[in-house]
Amino acid sequence: MGLPADSGAAIRGRPVIEGEAVRAGGGSGGVAPGDPCPHRPAVIDCLVTHHPHLPRDRMGHRMSRSGRSLIVEAVRAVHGLDVTARDLVRDVHKRWSVPAYGLTVSVAHCDAYSAVALSAGARVGVDLQDERDRPYAMRWLGELLGRTEPATIGDFAECEALIKASHVTKETFAGVRLPAWQPGWRATNVPPYRVRSAHLGRNMHLALVADRSAPVRWWWRAGRAARATRTDALTLEAA
Protein backbone atom coordinates (compact mmCIF):
# COMPACT_ATOMS: atom_id res chain seq x y z
CA MET A 1 0.00 0.00 0.00
CA GLY A 2 3.04 2.21 0.12
CA LEU A 3 2.82 2.93 3.82
CA PRO A 4 5.42 5.16 5.44
CA ALA A 5 8.22 2.85 6.54
CA ASP A 6 7.99 2.71 10.18
CA SER A 7 5.18 -0.89 13.15
CA GLY A 8 2.36 -2.27 14.95
CA ALA A 9 1.33 -4.80 17.52
CA ALA A 10 1.15 -8.41 16.39
CA ILE A 11 -2.03 -10.17 15.36
CA ARG A 12 -2.49 -13.43 17.19
CA GLY A 13 -3.88 -16.72 15.97
CA ARG A 14 -3.23 -19.63 13.68
CA PRO A 15 -4.87 -20.56 10.40
CA VAL A 16 -7.77 -22.98 10.31
CA ILE A 17 -6.26 -25.39 7.81
CA GLU A 18 -8.43 -27.55 5.58
CA GLY A 19 -7.20 -30.71 3.93
CA GLU A 20 -4.79 -33.54 4.53
CA ALA A 21 -1.49 -33.71 6.36
CA VAL A 22 1.91 -33.72 4.66
CA ARG A 23 1.95 -34.84 1.02
CA ALA A 24 4.59 -34.44 -1.68
CA GLY A 25 3.84 -31.86 -4.37
CA GLY A 26 4.23 -31.89 -8.13
CA GLY A 27 1.02 -32.26 -10.08
CA SER A 28 -1.55 -33.04 -7.38
CA GLY A 29 -3.47 -29.84 -8.12
CA GLY A 30 -5.24 -31.46 -11.05
CA VAL A 31 -5.26 -28.50 -13.45
CA ALA A 32 -5.30 -29.36 -17.16
CA PRO A 33 -4.39 -27.19 -20.16
CA GLY A 34 -7.24 -25.03 -21.43
CA ASP A 35 -9.35 -25.95 -18.40
CA PRO A 36 -10.66 -22.74 -16.77
CA CYS A 37 -13.73 -24.56 -15.33
CA PRO A 38 -15.39 -21.44 -13.88
CA HIS A 39 -18.19 -23.45 -12.25
CA ARG A 40 -16.15 -26.06 -10.40
CA PRO A 41 -15.69 -25.65 -6.62
CA ALA A 42 -12.95 -23.16 -5.82
CA VAL A 43 -9.84 -24.38 -4.02
CA ILE A 44 -6.88 -22.17 -3.15
CA ASP A 45 -3.33 -23.53 -3.07
CA CYS A 46 -0.92 -21.38 -1.05
CA LEU A 47 2.80 -22.18 -1.25
CA VAL A 48 5.26 -20.63 1.21
CA THR A 49 8.95 -20.97 0.29
CA HIS A 50 12.08 -20.20 2.30
CA HIS A 51 14.89 -18.50 0.36
CA PRO A 52 17.85 -18.70 2.76
CA HIS A 53 20.64 -17.44 0.47
CA LEU A 54 19.26 -14.31 -1.18
CA PRO A 55 21.90 -11.66 -1.96
CA ARG A 56 21.89 -8.30 -0.22
CA ASP A 57 22.19 -4.80 -1.62
CA ARG A 58 24.75 -2.17 -0.55
CA MET A 59 22.58 -1.20 2.42
CA GLY A 60 22.42 -4.80 3.60
CA HIS A 61 18.78 -5.29 2.60
CA ARG A 62 17.83 -8.71 1.30
CA MET A 63 17.09 -8.65 -2.43
CA SER A 64 13.98 -10.54 -3.54
CA ARG A 65 13.45 -12.63 -6.64
CA SER A 66 11.04 -11.46 -9.34
CA GLY A 67 7.34 -12.11 -8.93
CA ARG A 68 7.21 -13.80 -12.34
CA SER A 69 9.89 -16.34 -11.41
CA LEU A 70 8.20 -17.09 -8.08
CA ILE A 71 4.87 -17.71 -9.82
CA VAL A 72 6.43 -19.97 -12.46
CA GLU A 73 8.15 -22.04 -9.77
CA ALA A 74 4.95 -22.29 -7.70
CA VAL A 75 2.83 -23.47 -10.64
CA ARG A 76 5.44 -26.11 -11.40
CA ALA A 77 5.84 -27.17 -7.76
CA VAL A 78 2.14 -27.39 -6.91
CA HIS A 79 0.53 -28.43 -10.21
CA GLY A 80 3.48 -29.95 -12.08
CA LEU A 81 2.87 -27.67 -15.09
CA ASP A 82 5.77 -26.61 -17.31
CA VAL A 83 4.85 -22.94 -17.67
CA THR A 84 7.14 -20.01 -18.47
CA ALA A 85 6.97 -16.28 -17.81
CA ARG A 86 5.35 -15.84 -21.24
CA ASP A 87 2.30 -17.77 -19.98
CA LEU A 88 1.62 -15.14 -17.29
CA VAL A 89 -0.76 -12.23 -17.83
CA ARG A 90 -1.63 -9.15 -15.74
CA ASP A 91 -4.99 -7.41 -16.11
CA VAL A 92 -5.82 -3.72 -15.78
CA HIS A 93 -5.87 -4.13 -11.97
CA LYS A 94 -2.37 -5.71 -12.05
CA ARG A 95 -3.75 -9.12 -11.06
CA TRP A 96 -1.77 -12.14 -12.26
CA SER A 97 -3.25 -15.12 -14.11
CA VAL A 98 -2.22 -18.13 -16.19
CA PRO A 99 -5.03 -18.12 -18.79
CA ALA A 100 -4.02 -21.38 -20.49
CA TYR A 101 -4.78 -23.25 -17.27
CA GLY A 102 -7.56 -21.05 -15.89
CA LEU A 103 -5.46 -20.07 -12.87
CA THR A 104 -5.62 -16.80 -10.98
CA VAL A 105 -2.43 -16.05 -9.09
CA SER A 106 -1.02 -13.69 -6.47
CA VAL A 107 2.53 -13.40 -5.17
CA ALA A 108 4.25 -11.80 -2.18
CA HIS A 109 7.75 -11.82 -0.71
CA CYS A 110 9.14 -10.60 2.57
CA ASP A 111 12.63 -11.03 3.98
CA ALA A 112 13.69 -14.61 3.16
CA TYR A 113 10.18 -15.93 2.41
CA SER A 114 7.76 -15.87 -0.48
CA ALA A 115 4.10 -16.84 -0.79
CA VAL A 116 2.19 -17.67 -3.95
CA ALA A 117 -1.58 -18.26 -4.00
CA LEU A 118 -3.10 -20.18 -6.93
CA SER A 119 -6.74 -20.93 -7.70
CA ALA A 120 -8.74 -22.25 -10.64
CA GLY A 121 -12.05 -21.06 -9.21
CA ALA A 122 -11.49 -17.91 -7.14
CA ARG A 123 -9.86 -14.53 -7.57
CA VAL A 124 -7.05 -14.43 -4.98
CA GLY A 125 -4.63 -12.05 -3.29
CA VAL A 126 -1.81 -12.91 -0.88
CA ASP A 127 0.58 -10.85 1.21
CA LEU A 128 3.42 -11.41 3.66
CA GLN A 129 4.60 -8.88 6.25
CA ASP A 130 7.17 -9.10 9.02
CA GLU A 131 7.16 -7.34 12.38
CA ARG A 132 9.10 -4.10 12.17
CA ASP A 133 9.03 -0.92 14.21
CA ARG A 134 6.88 1.52 12.21
CA PRO A 135 4.44 3.21 14.62
CA TYR A 136 3.73 6.21 12.39
CA ALA A 137 2.66 3.98 9.49
CA MET A 138 0.42 1.89 11.74
CA ARG A 139 -1.26 4.98 13.21
CA TRP A 140 -1.89 6.27 9.70
CA LEU A 141 -3.35 2.94 8.56
CA GLY A 142 -5.50 2.74 11.68
CA GLU A 143 -7.01 6.14 10.86
CA LEU A 144 -7.57 5.07 7.24
CA LEU A 145 -9.46 2.01 8.53
CA GLY A 146 -11.65 4.22 10.74
CA ARG A 147 -10.11 3.12 14.04
CA THR A 148 -9.06 5.02 17.12
CA GLU A 149 -6.06 2.72 17.68
CA PRO A 150 -3.11 1.92 15.41
CA ALA A 151 -3.45 -0.90 12.90
CA THR A 152 -1.42 -4.08 13.29
CA ILE A 153 1.04 -5.63 10.88
CA GLY A 154 -1.60 -8.31 10.30
CA ASP A 155 -4.04 -5.57 9.25
CA PHE A 156 -1.39 -4.22 6.87
CA ALA A 157 -1.02 -7.67 5.27
CA GLU A 158 -4.80 -8.02 4.90
CA CYS A 159 -5.07 -4.59 3.24
CA GLU A 160 -2.31 -5.43 0.77
CA ALA A 161 -3.91 -8.80 -0.06
CA LEU A 162 -7.27 -7.08 -0.66
CA ILE A 163 -5.68 -4.64 -3.10
CA LYS A 164 -4.00 -7.52 -4.96
CA ALA A 165 -7.23 -9.53 -5.27
CA SER A 166 -9.76 -6.81 -6.03
CA HIS A 167 -10.43 -3.65 -8.03
CA VAL A 168 -9.52 -1.53 -4.98
CA THR A 169 -6.36 0.54 -5.40
CA LYS A 170 -4.16 2.48 -3.03
CA GLU A 171 -5.88 5.64 -4.28
CA THR A 172 -9.44 4.31 -3.71
CA PHE A 173 -8.78 2.50 -0.43
CA ALA A 174 -10.48 5.08 1.82
CA GLY A 175 -13.68 3.63 3.28
CA VAL A 176 -12.45 0.03 3.39
CA ARG A 177 -13.09 -1.65 6.75
CA LEU A 178 -11.61 -4.92 7.97
CA PRO A 179 -13.72 -7.27 10.13
CA ALA A 180 -12.45 -8.21 13.59
CA TRP A 181 -9.97 -11.08 13.44
CA GLN A 182 -11.13 -14.65 13.94
CA PRO A 183 -10.03 -17.97 12.45
CA GLY A 184 -11.13 -18.70 8.90
CA TRP A 185 -12.74 -16.46 6.29
CA ARG A 186 -14.33 -13.12 7.24
CA ALA A 187 -16.41 -10.88 4.98
CA THR A 188 -15.00 -7.43 4.14
CA ASN A 189 -17.09 -4.39 3.22
CA VAL A 190 -15.82 -4.76 -0.36
CA PRO A 191 -18.16 -7.48 -1.66
CA PRO A 192 -17.69 -10.23 -2.56
CA TYR A 193 -14.17 -10.30 -1.10
CA ARG A 194 -13.33 -12.21 2.07
CA VAL A 195 -10.12 -12.25 4.10
CA ARG A 196 -8.24 -14.62 6.38
CA SER A 197 -4.82 -14.32 8.00
CA ALA A 198 -2.40 -16.05 10.33
CA HIS A 199 0.56 -15.19 12.53
CA LEU A 200 3.28 -17.51 11.26
CA GLY A 201 6.11 -18.11 13.66
CA ARG A 202 7.45 -15.29 15.79
CA ASN A 203 7.32 -12.36 13.40
CA MET A 204 5.69 -13.18 10.05
CA HIS A 205 2.10 -12.55 8.96
CA LEU A 206 0.34 -14.11 5.97
CA ALA A 207 -2.99 -12.83 4.61
CA LEU A 208 -5.24 -14.29 1.93
CA VAL A 209 -8.16 -12.60 0.18
CA ALA A 210 -10.59 -14.28 -2.22
CA ASP A 211 -13.87 -13.42 -3.89
CA ARG A 212 -15.52 -16.40 -2.16
CA SER A 213 -14.88 -18.70 0.80
CA ALA A 214 -12.82 -21.66 -0.35
CA PRO A 215 -10.78 -24.48 1.17
CA VAL A 216 -7.07 -23.67 1.41
CA ARG A 217 -4.40 -26.25 0.69
CA TRP A 218 -1.20 -25.11 2.40
CA TRP A 219 2.19 -26.01 0.92
CA TRP A 220 5.73 -25.56 2.23
CA ARG A 221 9.16 -25.59 0.56
CA ALA A 222 12.33 -25.32 2.64
CA GLY A 223 14.24 -23.99 -0.39
CA ARG A 224 14.13 -23.67 -4.17
CA ALA A 225 15.58 -27.15 -4.64
CA ALA A 226 13.14 -28.76 -2.19
CA ARG A 227 9.86 -30.37 -3.17
CA ALA A 228 6.64 -28.72 -2.12
CA THR A 229 4.88 -30.65 0.65
CA ARG A 230 1.26 -30.40 1.76
CA THR A 231 0.79 -29.54 5.41
CA ASP A 232 -2.15 -28.92 7.71
CA ALA A 233 0.07 -27.09 10.20
CA LEU A 234 1.74 -24.30 8.26
CA THR A 235 4.34 -22.60 10.42
CA LEU A 236 7.64 -20.87 9.83
CA GLU A 237 9.00 -21.40 13.33
CA ALA A 238 11.12 -24.40 12.38
CA ALA A 239 12.47 -22.83 9.21
What does each of the following model-derived ranges do?
Residues G2-A239:
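Core catalytic alpha/beta fold that binds nucleotide/phospho-ligands
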